[in-house]
Amino acid sequence: MTRVLHLSDTHVSRTGPDEDGVDGVAALRQLLYDVRHIPALDLVVVSGDVADDGSREGCDVVRSLVGAFAAERGIPHIYSTGNHDRREGFAAALGFGHLGPDGAPIGRRTDLDGLLAGVSEVNGLRVITLDSLVPGETHGVLGRDQLDWLAAELATPAPAGSIVVLHHPPIFVDAIPYLESVVLQEPWALGDVLAGTDVRAVLCGHLHHQLSGSVGEKPVWVTPGVVTRIDLTAPSAHARGVLGAGATVVDLSGSPTFYTLHARDPRANTEVYVYDPLTGALS
């Protein structure tokens, strides 16, 4: 069995609190402390929006905290880019995102210019990170070249199968219409590549709320955010962000299972913002 601790959306910045006034460093510290007793972890994954301001300094802080957690357990820590990240800052701190227990790079980076995608193997599990970042935009895109690279990597099965990690979920949710404009565009193209391969699960972030779905025949899991989570009890067509760091443990024995964990924060559920995602107007 391979067990993954799946984090996302740490949103740490060089200057302290994020653009909503939330201390991402404190949220990450609290979460890592509260999950310290989870046994038999093999890997930590952070699926994007590592730095709220895209800075190297923000990525450095996350690498330091997550890296220390991973080093204590002798396990790798692997990161993908998100829409808040900037490739230059991400690469300066994290390389292409695949780091061993000692912080040294592991695996291979894609040979596609400028993209921070890569592949490594952990206890027979192939871990592939994709770069869905579109600078200056909220939505994600995987171009044809990156999809062809992914197909080539998946052409040969791995001993324990594969997981794919990217920031933008390749799913639409009819009940939340605005999501279509912010998730991965043309998700069916990814589904076509994954069909018939050994991929066990697709792990994503971006939405700050736990959510399951599928792309083609493959399960998709969206982990809750570390810095804030989205409270779906907000008024119609509005998004409410509240305090309360979360994460997921992914067990890849038999059918993949996903269970969420929440930091023991007495301020959890405190409202941070309410806004209209289509216009950006605060309520």
Descriptions of predicted regions:
Residues M1-V61, G67, V173:
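N-terminal active-site segment of His-dependent metallophosphoesterases
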Residues S8-A27, D52-G54, L94-D111, G136-R144, ...:
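Acidic/histidine-rich helix-loop elements
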Residues S13-G16, D52-R56, N83-A91, P135-T138, ...:
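Active-site environment of divalent metal-dependent phosphoester hydrolases
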Residues L31-L43, H139-W221, T248-V249, P256-F258, ...:
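His/acidic metal-ligating clusters that form di-metal
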Residues R56-W149, A189, V193-A195, G216, ...:
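Extended active-site neighborhood of metal-dependent phosphoesterases/phosphodiesterases
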